[in-house]
Amino acid sequence: MLTQEKITDALNDVLVPGISRSVSDMNLVQGFELQKNKVRISFASTALSESAQNWIGEKTREVIKGYGKGAEVEIEFLEKRPAEINRIENVIAIMSGKGGVGKSLVTSLTAIILNKQGYDVGILDADITGPSIPKMFGITLRPQGNDSGILPVQSANGIEIISINLFLSNEDEAVIWRGPLIGKAITQFWEDVLWGKLDFLLVDLPPGTADAPLTVLQVLPVTGTIIVFTPQDLTTMIVKKAVKMAQQMGKAVLGVVENMSYLYVPEINKKIEVFGKSRGAEMSLAAEAPLLARIPIDPELALLCDEGHIERYDSEVLKSYGAALATVIPASNKLH
């Protein structure tokens, strides 16, 4: 005999074609009605091709009949915009006033940590003219979708990713756009991508305090920021501008991360501060937020990024960063 609990369990087994998440995880289930052994299920057709809709319909009938023999299943698809469906608990912007400090690296490592902790995580690459997220994750697939929405591409471990580079014919093709077009692209990535249910959406920002960061902080419901910097005096001076931008726009600074903090040489068991002494305490004081991590210059990490296997990286530094993150992120808002 069919029950509402059995139907809910069955729908968790129906995966969305092109992405290894269920129709429930993508929040495509709009409701269902159960009368005795007959069930009527409503799905959103957002970002789904006709063949994908047909597949979901067939798979749904198959799994529900497995829970209740002789069950009658009616299915309908409703038009919905991604913005009506997405349920994203936390949006965290990774920012810095300076270029080349490793925002994309910190964004990726943060996503990997949260993913390992069991959260559903996505990355919105807002660095429209200099995207590097797909390269680090080894992603080359073009996002699927249609006029009703776009499906993000998943990493090997299930992190959802959207980036302008995934839409280009060649990865080294230049995106020569002025500010308004960049702002529009970021807004579309937020409103037109079917993210589904996410615990965290991390936004990788380009350097500076102009159009792109402004669009993200004004348009997206940012719940917190992480500031990235390196030890150089010139860098920390510029990065403080990003701290002030976040503060002036009422966005909480969750913490600061010092990248390229040192080089560890195991042969002599020594940390060499290549770019000078750590400025973690100084930046923590300026941001009024904790120092979450000091990420070293690590040849292994650099190689994994170049090879597109950043998710294979594991180190004590990463574990320490994860423990620090757990003290500042709103873990109580976990959806699953």
Specify the residue positions occupied by each region the protein language model found.
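Phosphate-binding loop that captures ATP/GTP phosphates
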Residues: L114, G118-E171, I176, G183, ...
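Inter-motif core of Ras-like GTPase G domains
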Residues: P213-L234
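Residue-level signature of catalytic and energy-coupling elements of molecular machines
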Residues: L11, V29, I88, G99, ...
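Short edge beta-strands and adjacent turn/loop segments
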Residues: P17-I41, E79-K80, I295
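C-terminal lobe/tail of nucleotide-utilizing enzymes
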Residues: L2-Q4, M26, S45-K59, V63, ...
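Switch II (G3) loop of P-loop NTPases
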Residues: G145, I164-P180, T187-T215
